[in-house]
């Protein structure tokens, strides 16, 4: 048995296509939209199309930005240290660093990591664009350090190594963010791999 | 810190307005749409507007139906017993009964329950429309029984009592669905109120 409305069925189907949205949730969302004014549906519909029509990748850092704002606000900002580039996998990771408010350099978004098993090679992510950025002759744009901030997965590590080998011959300092005990975490609840990394990465006091 | 794209921020805001969708989930859904082809966004956008433009309430049973299908398929069906009407709170509850495949009568959807604390009175839900249905003089449409299938809440019980008092003087049999132990449930895990109800509602074997 399905709903007595084809329009309702279709909207439930479309909601259920979204990741992490099951049929029960899709049904609840659809019923919610039924009870909302038409303007609510219009706003969500417009936002969906706008994201497809207006969002592009910044020609500098490959971060997401609006069509009428390229390079992105971060790349255009006069308050950023242009000698450091932090390399991240996704715009969400970039946002995580920005939220800390501590990092003041530039970014480069790879939009993925090298993953041979998934058929993703260096040319499928934004490695070439990174290389172009750090190779520019203009003195004012000289990048001195690239900080790799990829996820601690096998693919992330592989990608970090690959990029590091490309950049070092260019005389650029390449670093990697520290792995260790999260702030506020209790040692007894930390997994062994993290503990080992924390021990390896110990620093003098 | 927000995204470097206004279009992305707007879509996250709109997703986060949906019930049960937090900001993290909204962010994930937005990133998903960014990676989908434009047709995926178009389909969801169209489905949202269609639900507002095409869905109406059946003039007979108040169930949701499409504009070009009134009365709804259930009310038009020749295979239903027109002497019984099952009264439910919402289209979702109607669907739950239809899924069982056992009930073959008609329905009436109240679209809510009487709730004085929320300022919802009998005229704010579809009680008047139910009264009109059972009061029709045509012999062929004569309703003999109304089954109240509202949720076992204070408001549901109040509404059941209210409707029952309206219908009984009209010579219509009014019944209420049984409360009791769910099929397959183990007694030890059933709450006391349900156990008491099950005991009260015991039937001869
Ligand atoms: Zn940028
Ligand atoms: Zn109907």
Curated annotation (Swiss-Prot), chains A, B:
ZnF (C4-type) residues: 58-75
Function of the protein: May play a role in DNA repair. It seems to be involved in an RecBC-independent recombinational process of DNA repair. It may act with RecF and RecO.
Keywords: DNA damage, DNA recombination, DNA repair, Metal-binding, Zinc, Zinc-finger
Keyword Zinc-finger on entry: yes
Keyword Nuclease appears in the UniProt entry: no
Similarity comment: family membership: Belongs to the RecR family.
Protein name per Swiss-Prot or TrEMBL: Recombination protein RecR
Signal peptide start-end: none
């Amino acid at each position: 048995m399905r709903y007595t409305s084809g329009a309702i069925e279709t909207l439930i189907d479309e909601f259920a296509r979204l990741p992490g949205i099951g049929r029960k949730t899709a049904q609840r969302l659809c019923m919610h939209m039924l009870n909302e004014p038409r303007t609510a549906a219009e706003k969500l519909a417009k936002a969906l199309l706008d994201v497809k029509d207006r969002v592009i990748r910044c020609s500098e850092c490959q971060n997401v930005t609006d069509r009428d704002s390229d390079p992105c606000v971060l790349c255009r900002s006069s308050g950023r240290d242009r000698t450091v580039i932090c390399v991240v996998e996704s715009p969400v990771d970039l946002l995580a660093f920005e939220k800390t408010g501590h990092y003041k350099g530039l970014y480069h978004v790879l939009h993925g990591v090298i993953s041979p098993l998934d058929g993703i090679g260096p040319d499928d992510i934004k490695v070439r664009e990174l290389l172009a950025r750090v190779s520019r002759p203009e003195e004012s744009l000289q990048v001195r350090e690239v900080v790799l901030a990829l996820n601690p997965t096998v693919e992330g590590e592989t990608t970090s190594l690959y990029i590091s080998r490309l950049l070092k011959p260019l005389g650029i300092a390449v670093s990697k963010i520290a792995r260790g005990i999260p702030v506020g975490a209790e040692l007894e609840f930390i997994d062994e791999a993290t503990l080992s990394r924390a021990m390896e990465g110990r620093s003098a006091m």
